[in-house]
Amino acid sequence: MEPREMLSSCRQRGSESEFLQGSSSRSPPAPGCSGEPLKGISVGGERMEPEEEDELGSGRDVDCNSNADSEKWVAGDGLEEQEFSIKEANFTEGSLKLKIQTTKRAKKPPKNLENYICPPEIKITIKQSGDQKVSRTGKNSKATKEDERNHSKKKLLTAGDPTASDLKAFQTQAYERPQKHSTLQYDPGHSQGFTSDTLKPKHQQKSSSQSHMEWSSNSDSGPATQNCFISPEAGRDTASTSKVPALEPVASFAKAQSKKGSTGGAWSQLSSSSKDLLLGSVVPSPSSHNSPATPSSSAECNGLQPLGDQDGGSTKDLPEPPTLSSKKKSSKKDMISQTLPNSDLDWVKSAQKAFETTEGKREAYSADSAQEASPARQSISSVSNPENDSSHVRITIPIKTPSLDPSNHKRKKRQSIKAVVEKIVPEKALASGISMSSEVVNRILSNSEGSKKDPRVPKLGKMIENETPSVGLETGGNAEKIVPGGASKQRKPPMVMTSPTRTEHAPSGKLSEIQHPKFAAKRRCSKAKPPAMLREAVLATAEKLMVEPPSAYPITPSSPLYTNTDSLTVITPVKKKRGRPKKQPLLTVETIHEGTSTSPVSPISREFPGTKKRKRRRNLAKLAQLVPGEDKPMSEMKFHKKVGKLGVLDKKTIKTINKMKTLKRKNILNQILSCSSSVALKAKAPPETSPGAASIESKLGKQINVSKRGTIYIGKKRGRKPRTELPPPSEEPKTAIKHPRPVSSQPDVPAVPSSFQSPVASSPAAMHPLSTQLGGSNGNLSPASTETNFSELKTMPNLQPISALPTKTQKGIHGGTWKLSPPRLMANSPSHLCEIGSLKEITLSPVSESHSEETIPSDSGIGTDNNSTSDQAEKSSESRRRYSFDFCSLDNPEAIPSDTSTKNRHGHRQKHLIVDTFLAHESLKKPKHKRKRKSLQNRDDLQFLAELEELITKFQVFRISHRGYTFYHENPYPSIFRINFDQYYPVPYIQYDPLLYLRRTSDLKSKKKRGRPAKTNDTMTKVPFLQGFSYPIPSGSYYAPYGMPYTSMPMMNLGYYGQYPAPLYLSHTLGAASPFMRPTVPPPQFHASSHVKISGATKHKAKHGVHLQGTVGMGLGDIQPSLNPPKVGGATLSSSRLHKRKHKHKRKHKEDRILGTHDNLSGLFAGKATGFSSHLLSERLSGSDKELPLVSEKSKHKERQKHQHGEASHKVSKNNFEVDTLSTLSLSDAQHWTQAKDKGDLSSEPVESCAKRYSGSGGDSTRSEGLDVFSEMNPSSDKWDSDMGGSKRRSFEGFGTYREKDIQAFKMNRKERGSYESSMSPGMPSPHLKVDQTAAHSKSEGSISAMMARKKPTAVDSVAIPSAPVLSLLAASAATSDAASSSLKKRFKRREIEAIQCEVRKMCHYTKLLSTKKNLDHVNKILKAKRLQRQSKTGNNFVKKRRGRPRKQPSQFDEDSRDQMPVLEKCIDLPSKRGQKPSLSPLALEPASGQDAVMATIEAVIHMAREAPPLPPPPPPPLPPPPPPPPPPPPLPKTARGGKRKHRPQPPAQPAQPTPQPLPQEEEVKAKRPRKSRASESDVLP
């Protein structure tokens, strides 16, 4: 499909016929299977016939494009853009008859036509090959020519795409009908394909069999098709015969598929084509919107220039695209050649009816195509070919068969078609008027001419042309038009995209056909109506949406049509009949009936869509059944939703649609912009720009266009605005209420109709949006964001308060088929024609809408924007708009299907629930923002679109679901780590508190402006836990995306630990009870404090270890027996305290500032690096006030570590550094030295802290080492548990007693440091230096460990980000220390180390702060940068919040960062750390008296860090040496802590299970679990 699309793009660009191939190729490329049929269909419904395929395969696909293109581009003969001047415009019974005389100008259509029919907007440029006129005469030669051309192109297609032919055959089968709609609309060959295959059922069958068959027998059937083109009857016989044989087998399948492809396919193709077109060429879609039709009319007229050449007789389908114009001429000629078309049609009807009564419709299409292929077929190709693009099915079926046999039906259809044509003409005028005006005019003119020439053909042709060309045009044509003429045709790929949708829709049409197989005429009405209705409803909806915004333009064309009856004779009374009576009664009734929406559904929506809906419902139901999972994302989704209540899709689509409604209400521009951004339609962006302008025009421009452009009824602006808007509001309420009520029905309608509605609501500007949205929305069909885009488009129209519309939406599963757009327009009258013809009636509709809250009152000025679609919708029914907005808002978070239902139930809540903060906020404030709506529209454009897009992206990624908090109660901490672990956290973190998320969203909206942000910082700090835990998500739900990452926990999981999510998570999981339990404890508190924004007292409570423990439930000391919870709780509590302290730190910022380490850790790990200077964490660690909880925890950790570290100084150093240092020793040491610091053990602890810090610094390279250690850690989880458990247990045990044991700890620290330094300075020749280094290393690592301990609990994920360096340092340091400690402890005597330690402690006390600050500051800097990035991404939500309060500390943080950055560099640049650290160590240690010693320590740490990278794995090897040194005091603590090294003192080096022996088992368990947890934390962090 891509190749074909590219091929078609190439061909289309290469030549006009390639553009037609764009249509054909576009159809084929979009869906893989249907793409080819579409291609074949695009090439020609009959192009699928090998002949046609040959000439149209190359011709129809290429000839249609190639002929059109080669005729237009390649063949200069038919390359002229035919200008059609509208001689006559008759609106009879809602049917628009345009007599367009084709001036065979190579350039543009007459400016009169432009001005009259499409003022500037509708530029009908029918680029027909000279052959278009000649097509009748030179049809055979042209057919041959184009056959050759097509053949060559088809060879190109077939040769370049041998599979393309097969795929084309196949895709033609799948998309042939869609392409029949798409290409057949503009392809006589296509039409012939229609004729032979009825392009919908038959051609799809043919597509399957005949496509392959025809592709196989390109020359064979191609000649037949050529003959069809040349001799419509003969070729049609061949084509039909080919189709009959080939299609008969595939008849059922092709019928089903063809119905999908043709009815649903027409829709799907249109939608999909539009989508593909918009997606592929959504930007060109507006101009290309006519292009599918316009490739029929413009591309086909341009491309139809070959079609014009093919115009004669059946004019080979490919030449028929020129015949489109030519057929518009040929439509006149069709009157002349009607014998041929009639005979052809009759033959085709006979053959096709024989082929398939059900197919008969498709055959009608085929017959239409055949007729079009023949002069009548040219006429139909004029009509049908113009609409071949999108609406060929409708046009051809009703026109063709109705033309021949069901003239009555055709007339009915023609009324419908005329209504549609009127709609579509305006739509075309609008869609084309923007970008496809000439093509629209061409198509309209072609349709009109074709209609006039071939009354039956024009009727259905017009209807279909209006429908499909409008859709196809708007979809394809818009895309194509948006794409340059060539690009337009090239943009027929939207037909490809449309093909899936069209296939989907075609099944509806086919189902209609199947439903009415015997009634070929009726089926044509049925099919034409259900497919046409689908197309009309959807396409008309799209067209209406496109046309209705253009409605001003169409009205303006209507003004020319109306005003300049000389040029256009527009009979508006019929329109009025159609639109007003039906619309008003339905409006009033439906408004009342619709429930939420007051706006009545368009009467046509009711009646037409009702009739068609029934058929289409079945079709849709069948379609949903037939095409439930196809790539008809939007159309089919919506069809599915309509049909099958595809829960997710339905809700999603409904959400999307509803959201889009709100967007459209709020901002059509936003809708368009959001569409493109949401849909990620890069191609759509250009049309978006024009659609954006169009959207603005749509808002202002419906009235402005009405008043300005719509010189027609300038005075009627109000009436017109409401009427123009009224249909969109009608659709909008339909969509809106459809969304709430018939979710299943809604998606079908929203998919196409809503999108169409959206453009309709959009206004002329919305014309582009429609085509853009048609393409884009349909393009959105597959992506959720596309869906959202589509629904945004839909919601845009839904913005208009037509609440009654939802009834329509409910009415039919084919709500998409409602004649929603047609009904909208038809509701006014023949809907669009009614609007064009009866702008006065439009006033009435607004009155009805006014009844719907939408209102004439909101007219507030004739030209005022108040009645603009968005304004009117916004103004009209705030409640309804709210509903729509609610629906809308949940549209974006498509992942929140329940939200949609909830939102439907709880509008405000769900508004909040809207991930879209702006949307939710706006939703809440919509009543307030009535006056602000204009600004809000802009706001929506910028902020909302950005937020919406981001949110859509996020929610596409994140599935927001409501989960029980208890799910995370078990393992809240791991839940934290699960923040972005795929299974656990992403769901909890977003899903967790949708209500709170919504509330948070609204609160953030309101409170973000207040002082809330700072609290959010705190919350953010805690949110990770909260999010990770059961409760966090309420505060985290909103912050989860922002807050959690800010906390750096999610970031860590996502970024740093995305690589190692399992280790962190696993380590916690392995220490599952403890990590899970421990998080459970802090999270509630964190959650309460953060979520509740606990005041300082609560923070202090949480801060205090006891309080934290008590509050946490399994606090540090409380759960001491279970060391895992305590350890995890300890770490978590540290961070919890840090979080509280962070807040407290904000109060005590200066105090903490002095001791940057604590704050750094707090800030870093609180995820508020900005808020916390590195020293703050250090101070918090050492800060007495903050030390209470932290020191208590740290005391436990320190005590453990001191016991472990002191008792097993060497061993513990090894253990801590090797494994436990990553988690336990680093944490324990950090806590240890912090406690020592806090308790006056500062001299010993600072040394260790410095040593640790620098070991941590040097450990950056050990990050990998830490990872190794981490890997090691998981394997030796027992060892880690023992080590960590003992150390942490001791720390926890010492939580309250540590200060008592402070001296003990200090002594043990000294011993530990002695052994640690000895092990730490393996490469340091000077014991003193080594001791200093070790002390500094210990201190730095202790600080880091403390930071990690706090930071980890605070935000393990947060730690993961900042700690990645720090913990890596710790890991490296720990591993280095462990490894080095094992060997160095032997080497260096404890006394030397102790002597050095004493010295280093003095220096390190200050150095500790500096180094901690530096490390933390650097981490904070990193976090700050990440936070800023995240904030930037999140719209500075947290930038404001975080920056708000932390700004006090940023300078300090910066200072710390300056200091820390070098340290971090040291840490990171392990190889260069040795050189850096000494130089950096002065930076860190310059203030310290023992600067040299610190430098030496740093150097030793660096040296060890260098050694460390190998050491993390080596730590176990060093284990043997360490055992002898550790025994002095450490044995027990060491065993407790490092009880897993070879010796209990050095168990860390050992597997980690020996610890139990030396350590009390409880301590060992503690050591085990905490160590594992911490090791896990530390390791995960690295």
Curated annotation (Swiss-Prot):
UniProt KW keywords: Acetylation, DNA-binding, Nucleus, Repeat
UniProt keyword Transit peptide present: no
Gene Ontology CC, one term: cytosol
Record's subcellular location: Nucleus
Residue numbers bearing the N6-acetyllysine modification: 808
DNA-binding positions: 575-587, 1007-1019, 1440-1452
Protein name: SET-binding protein
Gene name of this polypeptide: Setbp1
